[in-house]
């Protein structure tokens, strides 16, 4: 695969570093509560749209700047395959879909490499235009700087721990995920390290008393 070096790689690296720093809610990853859905999913409830969009923009910039000739299907198609479900019928399950799409991609690339390299029908050569490289990198960096500022605001103003607790529980997407996938036990678990209650955050439990277990 062809690539060209430039300052855009430094910008992309900075965006990627910010994206790693702003990963939140590691201590609150759950599985759909029994009885809530016919298919139980892996739910990373704090991985909501601000982080997903910033990640997608960074990942696109990184791969376009590093492996430009397969950006169309390795970046755009793979990212849409997990982002569209995460924004529609599978809220809170972006990480699950991302894992599956990467597994399929790596497996196909390993088992059927002749399909994914020239001169296959789905292969297309990138323009190798430095202006495109710098635009992708700048957009990714700006998005991740904005995400970092929002992340820092949530930590400082609300005094929340981004690792052991959750940050984005005021967002509508967060509330939707909790209502669709969490029973009372998980609702109380998600907020056990912040002062706000499930009622105050908009996902009322059936019982006002946390389960004993």
Language model regions located:
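C-terminal transmembrane-bundle signature of multipass membrane proteins
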Residues: 74-202, 211
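Compositionally biased, intrinsically disordered low-complexity regions
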Residues: 27-29, 167, 204
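C-terminal amphipathic "assembly/sorting" segment characterized by alternating charged
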Residues: 207-213
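Generic multipass alpha-helical transmembrane bundles of integral membrane proteins
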Residues: 1-93
């Amino acid at each position: 695969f062809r690539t060209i070096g430039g300052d855009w790689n430094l910008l992309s690296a900075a965006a990627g570093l910010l994206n790693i720093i702003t990963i939140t809610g590691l201590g609150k990853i759950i599985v759909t509560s029994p009885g809530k859905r016919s298919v139980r999913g892996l739910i990373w409830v704090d991985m909501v749209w601000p982080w997903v969009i910033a990640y997608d923009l960074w990942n696109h910039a990184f791969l376009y700047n590093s492996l430009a000739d397969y950006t169309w299907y390795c970046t755009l198609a793979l990212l849409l395959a997990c982002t569209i479900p995460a924004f529609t019928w599978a809220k809170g399950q972006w990480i699950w879909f991302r894992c599956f799409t990467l597994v399929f991609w790596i497996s196909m690339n390993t088992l059927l490499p002749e399909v994914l390299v020239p001169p296959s029908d789905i292969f297309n050569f990138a323009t190798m235009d430095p202006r495109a490289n710098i635009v992708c990198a700048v957009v990714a960096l700006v998005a991740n700087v904005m995400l970092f500022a929002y992340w820092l605001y949530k930590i400082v103003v609300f005094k929340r721990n981004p690792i052991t607790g959750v940050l984005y529980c005021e967002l509508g997407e967060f509330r939707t995920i909790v209502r669709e996938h969490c029973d009372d036990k998980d609702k109380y678990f998600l907020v056990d390290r912040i002062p706000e209650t499930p009622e105050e955050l908009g996902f009322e439990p059936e019982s006002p008393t946390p389960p004993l277990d």
